[in-house]
Amino acid sequence: MPKEFIVAIELGSSKMTGIAGQKNLDGSITVLATVEEDSSSCIRKGVIYNIDKTCQCLTNIIKKLKNILKQDITQVYVGVGGRSIRSIKNVIVKDLPGNTIISQEMINELMDINRNMTYPDQEILDAATQEYKIDNQYQIDPVGIQCNHLEGIFLNILWRKNFYNNINTCFENANIPIAEMYLAPLAMADSVLTDSEKRAGCMLVDLGADTTTVSVYYKGILRHLSVIPLGGGNVTKDLTCLQIEEPDAEKMKLKYAKAYTDINNIDPTLNYPIDKDRVVESKKFIEIVEARVEEIVENAWFQIPVEFSDKLLGGIILTGGGSNMPEIDKVFKTHTHIDKVRIAKFVSQTVNSRDPKITNHDGTMNTVLGLLAKGDMNCAGDEIGTDLFSNSAEKPVAAEQHKAPRNPNETAGKGVVLTAAEKAAADEAARKQKELEEAEARLLAEKEAEEEEKRRKENSLIHKMMRGFKKFVKDTISEEE
């Protein structure tokens, strides 16, 4: 087995996926191993709710990968997503002295102020710069421009603090170091969207089991991100009204369900078998499926900010397991009135693999492959020997790689989520900077107070009388001389 590889883990609502692979010089990816664990008992709507069971799933994922790779794993890349992730705009204003030339330090200051914003029970995972307002004009890169008034417009991506803390706790308890955390929707977007689609304006919809994630890009920049707590699993749950268990409902959905069926093509005599003794009319089955699909599509379209609804020249891109439902693209065309709809069955990178989960090209592996593509540090550890009598001291050891400490501004808008350690370091740096600024402000205030006291004394009545008396004495002496 290779001595170097990258490992990524996706925390999905229906399954947890682990993948190991190598990035080749030609830009392609070679997948070395893929494993899965059922996560339905510990992750709901993409959010961890049972820490112990999640730790066990993570441990099993790593154990399976190590057995295949015959090597230890020192760290992993992790995708962050799920319910309650949302984006919110924030504007930071700075008035400048007349005709000030904007420097990179000024831009960094705006970014720092924005990053240190606080939201009740929310954590800022990332902040994507939208644009800058220079006096009355908008610019993407304002450095070097003269102005009196500077505004930074940012898109802050928020998540519940306890959800963020739970992820860090699970990996700590499972003793699995995190190489880097990424916003899963952004990692996937970079792998399935073209640069042209991002520039022209597009809507990316990831149709998952428990959630549907909507991302909007325009002029190459992320403009909106939201997660809807609805997915393909809701269709399955609706079908249980036929008095069948969820596993059987899922099988029926995969075999018979279509997102849209022309009413003229519905055969009133056609029945679908539920079990060996029961059937359901195809018309009733179709109504159940279509009602939920329409709700998901309408909710996804409702997420699009009004100012971008007419700027989606790149169209709508569908991905995820739910995009495999026949006629799903037609439903999106009908409800959004956008004819340009593409189904992204696979990532844009060339991927070498014989694993059916990869070669099926069904959209279910796009996120974890996107995470793998983001990796740039070796995750391989010691080789695991199979010879019980070999000298363990002679085993080759792979060098561990760790990223140097970074300022959050370096990765802003790229989907990189600070780990708990990085966040603690950033918070400490922000605290020290705030203390320094407060100390400077106090010194300035004290100096101004001293000058004011001096002016006050100079303008006091006694001081004026003393100055007048001194002047009188001086003038008198001059006359006598």
In which residue ranges do the predicted regions lie?
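A short acidic Gly-Thr/Ser loop motif
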Residues: 9-15, 80-81, 196, 204-211, ...
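Nucleotide/phosphate-binding catalytic cleft detector across ATP-hydrolyzing
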Residues: 1-15, 19-202, 259, 307, ...
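Conserved phosphate/pyrophosphate-binding and hydrolysis machinery centered on Walker-type P-loop NTPases
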Residues: 157-160, 322, 361
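Short helix/loop capping segments that flank catalytic or ligand/cofactor-binding pockets
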Residues: 88, 213-215, 225
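Short, composition-biased local secondary-structure segments
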Residues: 134-144, 203-209, 294-302
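Short amphipathic alpha-helical segments
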Residues: 20-21, 90-91, 216-218, 329-331
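Residue-level signature of catalytic and energy-coupling elements of molecular machines
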Residues: 8-9, 18, 78, 171, ...
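C-terminal region/appendage detector
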Residues: 1-6, 23, 31-36, 72-75, ...
